[in-house]
Amino acid sequence: MDFIIFTKKIKMINNIPFTISCIITGIILFQSFFIAPTINKIINTKEASKFLRYIWPKFFLIILILSTLSLIANYYLGIEKNIAKYFMILCIVFMIVCYFITPIINKAKDNSKNKLWSILHLATVILTLFALILNILIINYWEFNHN
């Protein structure tokens, strides 16, 4: 009986990166499809802008931290899922880029540099979409390639 419990605990620990990818996927979907559109509909433009400027950097930072924790867990646990590791590294890079260009996006908006704002905003949207896809791929890869 104790061996079965121990085995289940080991399996749970080895699935930490999988669980983190599920969390990241949920965060991205919730933020992108519920929070941001709702804010733009129910709050005036000025207040929505303030709120979104506050929340987006934290959004990128949370995904960056979770991706880093997942990568660390992968290495620490000695999990031999290299594709998942590479995907996590890409997510980390994408979120670093998004985090650091967010102030530039805000400044472009403030200075009415709409073309620059559009390009950089689109870049963060695309990088976030790629992060979502990578995490979905990690989930699928993990599910179909058990240890």
Predicted regions and their residues:
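Polytopic transmembrane helical bundles with strong interfacial aromatic enrichment
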Residues: 4-147
